[in-house]
């Protein structure tokens, strides 16, 4: 007797997910999923709810309607925060700490064991030699690179990236694409928001388009 093949559930799935603010709909209801080894590219104009969607998924905003599943199981808010690494518009860095101190601090703050040494992460994002530089001395692009180093250190399998190409030059955009590709090759997944004309990362990509509420 041939046993049926068992297909692994999606790394993340959303069912009838919706969010409103002051009784005005922001997005939804949405149904989508992302498998291990692929990226979900979330597109839409400003005001379409891209950032809000990622904040809901990350557990930073309450789920009003719908369901979020991780590996086929309904995920509570705290479970999602441990499973996901969120890179938002604000880098979330300590201005009076050095780049290296920030990475050590943030790893300890979340109680996560980094998958690499912080110094190696700085080199990967092009900040070798800036270990002792204070964050307040960095340019916007350098701060974005430091936030990318923090992302790289996270063991979370799902990356939530809100406009990751913002404040980056062409080399920085290439860096983001390489990081996403490496993360997916390791069995991770990524949700990436964009409203610009940037090329999608060179990986297996699923598309989700949001439209601003009327």
UniProtKB/Swiss-Prot annotation:
UniProt keyword terms in alphabetical order: ATP-binding, Cell inner membrane, Cell membrane, Cytochrome c-type biogenesis, Membrane, Nucleotide-binding, Translocase, Transport
GO BP annotations listed: cytochrome complex assembly
Superkingdom of this protein's organism: Bacteria
Molecular functions (GO terms): ABC-type heme transporter activity; ATP binding; ATP hydrolysis activity
Annotated localization: Cell inner membrane
Enzyme superclass (EC): translocase
Segments forming domain ABC transporter: 12-214
Catalytic activity of the protein: heme b(in) + ATP + H2O = heme b(out) + ADP + phosphate + H(+)
Enzyme Commission number(s): 7.6.2.5
Membrane topology: Peripheral membrane protein
Binding site for ATP: 44-51
Annotated GO CC locations: plasma membrane
Assembly and interaction partners: The complex is composed of two ATP-binding proteins (CcmA) and two transmembrane proteins (CcmB).
PANTHER family: ABC TRANSPORTER I FAMILY MEMBER 1
Role: Part of the ABC transporter complex CcmAB involved in the biogenesis of c-type cytochromes; once thought to export heme, this seems not to be the case, but its exact role is uncertain. Responsible for energy coupling to the transport system.
Similarity-based family: Belongs to the ABC transporter superfamily. CcmA exporter (TC 3.A.1.107) family.
Name under which the protein is recorded: Cytochrome c biogenesis ATP-binding export protein CcmA
Species for this entry: Xanthomonas euvesicatoria pv. vesicatoria (strain 85-10)
Gene: ccmA
